[in-house]
Amino acid sequence: MLKLSDIKVGDILIADNIDGSEYKVLEAERREDACYFYIENLKTRVRSSLRIRDGNEARSGIAKIVHA
């Protein structure tokens, strides 16, 4: 399972879904309540935010990480 502490700006996140969308991490902020990421879909160039609150593991549909 992916640890949130492993995610850095510039990393590529690969979603755990049918098309395996790839997202580049543009910003990363860690707070006590959650981790917040600003990401960009590399195929569509759509930018969105991602908040993960479940302890220190990413359980938001992202399967693996590829370091840039």
What annotation goes with each model-predicted range?
Residues 34-38:
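Short aromatic-glycine-enriched beta-strand elements
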Residues 1-9:
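Mixed-charge, Lys/Arg-rich low-complexity intrinsically disordered regions
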Residues 41-68:
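Intrinsically disordered, low-complexity, charged/polar segments
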Residues 21-30:
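Short beta-strand-centered aromatic/proline hotspots
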